[in-house]
Amino acid sequence: MTSKNKIELLTEHLIKIISETNGISLADTLELAVMGDSKSDHPLIKKSIQEFRRLINDFHSDEIDIKTLLNHPVSQALFGFFKRFPRPYIEEHIHLTGSLSAEFIHPHLMKLLEGPDRRIYFSIIDKVYGPGCAENIKTVSDVDQLIRLKEDEFFDRYLKILLLPKLILTTKEMHAAAAYHMARELYNKYNVGMIRLKFTLSRATQSSDEQIPGLENLTEEDVVLGLYDGFMAFKKKVPEFDFVLSPCFRKEEDFFDATKFKTKKEHFLHQVDAILELLEKYPFLNPYLCEVDTVGSEKDLFRKGHFAQMQQGFRKLHFKGFSIRSHHGETWHTLKRGVQAVDNALNIWHIDALEHGLSLGINPNFYFHSLYRRLIVDNERGAKVKVGSSDWKELMDMDWREHTSIREKLISGDPLLESERREFVKVKFHTAREVEHYQHDVLNRMIHKGVGLIALPSSNNKLTNSFSDYKDHPFSWWEKKGLKLGVGTDNYITLNTNYIQELLILLFTDAENLKITKLLMVATGETRRPYLSQLLWKMRGHSTHKS
C-alpha cells in the first residue's frame, strides 16, 4: 500500500466515524475507530490509528512535540477531512505581507533587484538580513528562506522579516495581483472561503528601515481599490468566496508621516477621513470596507493616555457603522499590563473584537509560581536577575510594601533567608490573585458585550515566550468559558503554518474535551448543529475536493 493510498483510506475511515458520532472529541473518535474486530477493518489502518493515539498521549506528557503529530499519516488524514468539509472556513485574522508565497514574491522582487534602483534595494535588504544578502537572492528557494521565521527568532525579528513583500507592494496593480493570489491559494489549498484581510492603509513612517522606494506615490485609494479588484476577480470565478478589507493602523508613536503631519493623531484622523471619502466616492466598497484594526508592538502602550491619540478617529468610524478590532494582549512587559492594555482597548476604543488576547488566557497562579520557582533556583546558585529582563520587570511591578529588600536581594543574587522566601511566596500569591481577578473582570465584560476573541495558536507560540508549548494555548478554556471565538493564522507563510494546521493544533491540544463539531462551528461560523450533522454525513464516499 502506498503512502497516498494509506492516507486516503484513513481519511475515509475517519469521515465515517466522525459522521456517525456527530463530531465528538478526537480522543473518543480515535478510540471508536479501533474498537472491535470487524471483517471490514484494514489492519494497517487500525495499527496507524493506535500508534497515533499513543503519540497524542506522549505529546501531552512532553515526550514528543507537535511536529511529530502533524507529520503522522493520521494527522494528514485529518487534514484531508477538514479540507473536504463542505462548508468553507472563515480566516478571521490574516495579514497581506506575511501571507504571500515565495513563488509570488520572487519574480516581482527580482525585477527590483535587477533594475536601475537595485543598490537602494540591496541596502534596505542588507540592513535587515546582513551584508551581501541581497546580491545572493537568485531563486524562489532563496526568497522562501528569507520570509520564514526561524525556530530561534521571535516577535521583534518577525516584524522585520516582513520586508520583502513590502518592497513589491508599491502599486495598485501589485495589490490586486497579491489579493487574487492569496484568495486562490487559501480557497484551493485550505478550504478558506472568507478572508478578513489585515493590511496597511498607509506605510508612512519615520523609521529609516521602512523607507521604501515608490511608497511616496502609493495612495490609500490605490491600496484599497487594488485589493478589492483582486478579491473581486477571484469572487467572479468562485461566487461563494467572500472577504472583508480591514485597514490596520500601527499603534507605535513614531508610525506616522512626519513630513506631512505634526502628530500621529493628525495623521490618523486624515486616514479615517480618507476611508470615509473612499466609501462616498466608491459606494460599492461599503459591504467590504467596514472595519479597521490596530497592529504593532504594544509593550509600551498600555495606559489610558496611550489610547488617546486614536480615540477620536475610532469614535468617528463607530458612528459611521464600522467595527473596531484590535491586536492586544499579545506581548507585554508584565502580565498585568497585558491585561490592562485589553481593558483600555475595551473601555476607550470600544473594540468589537480582540485579536490574540493571550494575556487573558495565561493562568496567573501558574505564571507567577513558575516565576517564583525559577528565581528561587537561580538565587540558590547566586545568579542575578538581569536588569530589563521579563523576570526583572515582573519583580519591579509587584507590590512589595516594606519588603523591597527581598526584591533587591533577588536581583543582586544574594541568598534569601527562609523567612524571606515565605514573604516572596506571599507577594507573588497576592499579585497572581489580583491579576486573576482583573482577567476575569475583563473576560466577563467581553462575554456580556459579545466582543469576539480571535485565537492564533502558532503566532502566539512562536512570537511570545508566554507559554512553552502549543498544548498550553487557552483556546479550550476560552471556549468553555463561553467566549465568542474565531481562528486566524496571522502571517501563515512567515510562521510556517496554514489554516487547517491551526485547526489540527487546537484539536490535538485538547483531544479529550474539544469536540470536532464545536471546532467546525467556530471555523465556519455555522451554529446550526443539525445542519452541520447533515454536512458531515454528506462527506461519506465523496473523495472529490478542491485542487
Predicted regions and their residues:
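Metal-cofactor-binding active-site regions of metalloenzymes
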Residues: 2-547
